[in-house]
Amino acid sequence: MALISRSCGAASRYSSSHLFLPSKGAEAANVYCNRLSTAASTSSSSSPSPSTHNDRKKDLREDGLNLQDFISGELSEKSKWEEYRGNLKREKGERLRLPPWLKTEIPIGKNYNKLKNTLRELNLHTVCEEARCPNIGECWGGGEYATATATIMLMGDTCTRGCRFCSVKTARRPPPLDPDEPYNTAKAIAAWGLDYVVLTSVDRDDIPDGGAEHFAKTVSNIKERNSKILVECLTPDFRGDLAAVEKIALSGLDVYAHNVETVRELQRHVRDPRANFDQSLSVLRHAKKVKSSVLTKTSIMLGLGETDAQIQATLTELRDSGVDCLTLGQYMQPTKRHLKVEEYVTPEKFAFWEKVGQEMGFIYTASGPLVRSSYKAGEFFLKNLLEKRKTEETTATAE
């Protein structure tokens, strides 16, 4: 069974409930991964539970944002954003209110319904639904760019790590991998008729290669069914195992993504102790080293307390390491147990960082409050870029 990841970076918590509730954030996958999903159904969540454990899950579920938090309201129009007078930086003991620029529209559309129905029929899950991403209507519906995309999470719903921004459930030894998952995932993607697919996963430190072979098999199965579909892999760091990175980089993928998540100075505060900035840089550098034509991509969450100088320095290190594509989005607190949002960054500030990224030479920079590592508009741009490159390579070979 293919599951889904949180666009904020690692992976999302699996849910058997199929209600659409837009996410508070982050890919992940990426895109990022900041939203608690639960295995409780809508009907059971309203009935009293005799178990303290179930009560706790209900409490945590209610701590997060719901559909109404994200649906466009009276201040959602851009012309009215300046009227917002709520605090954007957190004071001690305070929990910030969601600003109007994080509002979105209810997802609709023919292609949206097609993907949703196929998921039900094949009993598959995507990061888009399970992370309750607010961009789901744009991505699934084709939207302005007429390029349908989805993000699939491989290797289960349980992570071996515990990052402080991510609500995915954790265990030292998650259930074993499903050997049929690569084939079944490729079958589902072929049925959807997608142009661009993102594969991501939880961390699986319990597996010798971290699941790299499983990733590679999935890419191969997808490409065998449709060589034209573009595949992005948003991978873990494999604890620095570059052989695992190489296996995926050479699997036939088009984009190799790995998220550094935050600035260098906040790594230990935000990520699991087994992850670090230099290890993530080595993953991105090695992917480019073994396959120079592959596009490398990473994502950063803003609003965790980073400074402008730290962001600038982080972007410089990423560019110096040969990273091609960059996304920056707003961090969202999934539950009260997770890191608080220190600041809601304004759209103007996100636009500033997008300009900085472009000037630094990133091939593509997407920066905005609702931008995630797996983001529709970015995939449209990358699709056109990759197709242009392939055409040029074919022409050069023919000559």
UniProtKB/Swiss-Prot annotation:
Any GO BP: lipoate biosynthetic process
GO MF annotation terms: 4 iron, 4 sulfur cluster binding; lipoate synthase activity; metal ion binding
Chain sites annotated for binding [4Fe-4S] cluster 1: C128, C133, C139, S374
Subcellular location(s) of the protein: Mitochondrion
Catalytic activity: [[Fe-S] cluster scaffold protein carrying a second [4Fe-4S](2+) cluster] + N(6)-octanoyl-L-lysyl-[protein] + 2 oxidized [2Fe-2S]-[ferredoxin] + 2 S-adenosyl-L-methionine + 4 H(+) = [[Fe-S] cluster scaffold protein] + N(6)-[(R)-dihydrolipoyl]-L-lysyl-[protein] + 4 Fe(3+) + 2 hydrogen sulfide + 2 5'-deoxyadenosine + 2 L-methionine + 2 reduced [2Fe-2S]-[ferredoxin]
First and last residues of the transit peptide: 1-14
Alphabetized InterPro entries for the sequence: Aldolase_TIM (IPR013785), Elp3/MiaA/NifB-like_rSAM (IPR006638), LIAS_N (IPR031691), Lipoyl_synth (IPR003698), rSAM (IPR007197)
GO cellular component, one term: mitochondrion
Cofactor info, note text: Binds 2 [4Fe-4S] clusters per subunit. One cluster is coordinated with 3 cysteines and an exchangeable S-adenosyl-L-methionine.
Top-level class of the enzyme under EC nomenclature: transferase
Record-listed E.C. numbers: 2.8.1.8
Chain ranges of the Radical SAM core domain: 144-363
Keywords (A to Z) from UniProt: 4Fe-4S, Iron, Iron-sulfur, Metal-binding, Mitochondrion, S-adenosyl-L-methionine, Transferase, Transit peptide
Superkingdom to which the source organism belongs: Eukaryota
Keyword ATP-binding applies: no
Name of the protein described by the UniProt record: Lipoyl synthase, mitochondrial
Cofactor (UniProt): [4Fe-4S] cluster
Originating organism: Danio rerio (Zebrafish)
Family, as annotated: Belongs to the radical SAM superfamily. Lipoyl synthase family.
Coarse class of the protein's main subcellular location: mitochondrion
Residues annotated as binding [4Fe-4S] cluster 2: C159, C163, C166
Region (Disordered), start-end ranges: 39-60
